[in-house]
Amino acid sequence: MKTLLLTLVVVTIVCLDFGHTLICYNYWTPLDKTTECCGNGVTTCFAKSWNDHRGRRTDRGCGCPNVKPGIHLNCCKTDRCNG
C-alpha cells in the first residue's frame, strides 16, 4: 500500500505543471498498474487488445494509434480513462 501511495505521489509531482498534462495507464497486466504523463498536446489515452498464442493481450498508453484489422482499440480523453 505504501508503494502504491508513493507511486501516485511521484506521478503527481512529475505531472505537475502550469498547464494540464494527461495521465494514462501504460501497464500490461492488472497486477502492474503504472501510469505515464503524456507529452504536451497529447489529448487521448488508448487501450488496444488482441488475441495471440499467449491469449488475450492488452497495450495501453498515450495517444490514439492506428491499428491493424482484428485489434480492438478504445481511445478516451480523461486522466486514467484507459484502465
Swiss-Prot record:
Signal sequence: where?
1-21
Q: In its keyword annotation, does this UniProt entry include Nucleotide-binding?
A: no
Parts of the chain that traverse the membrane: none
Q: Which subcellular locations apply to this protein?
A: Secreted
Q: Which cysteines are joined by disulfide bonds?
A: C24-C45, C38-C62, C64-C75, C76-C81
PROSITE patterns per UniProt: SNAKE_TOXIN
Which of UniProt's keywords are assigned here?
Acetylcholine receptor inhibiting toxin, Disulfide bond, Ion channel impairing toxin, Neurotoxin, Postsynaptic neurotoxin, Secreted, Signal, Toxin
Coiled-coil intervals, chain numbering: none
Its Gene Ontology molecular function terms? acetylcholine receptor inhibitor activity; ion channel regulator activity; toxin activity
Q: Which GO terms describe its cellular component?
A: extracellular region
UniProt note on tissues of expression: Expressed by the venom gland.
Task: Return the Gene3D superfamilies for the record.
Answer: CD59 (2.10.60.10)
Superkingdom assignment: Eukaryota
- What InterPro entries has UniProt attached to this entry? Snake_3FTx (IPR003571), Snake_toxin-like_sf (IPR045860), Snake_toxin_con_site (IPR018354), Toxin_cobra-type (IPR054131)
Query: What is the protein's quaternary organization?
Result: Dimer.
User: What is the protein's known function?
Assistant: Binds to muscle nicotinic acetylcholine receptor (nAChR) and inhibit acetylcholine from binding to the receptor, thereby impairing neuromuscular transmission.
Record's family?
Answer: Belongs to the three-finger toxin family. Short-chain subfamily. Type I alpha-neurotoxin sub-subfamily.
Q: What is this protein called?
A: Three finger toxin MALT0054C
- Native source organism of the sequence: Micrurus altirostris
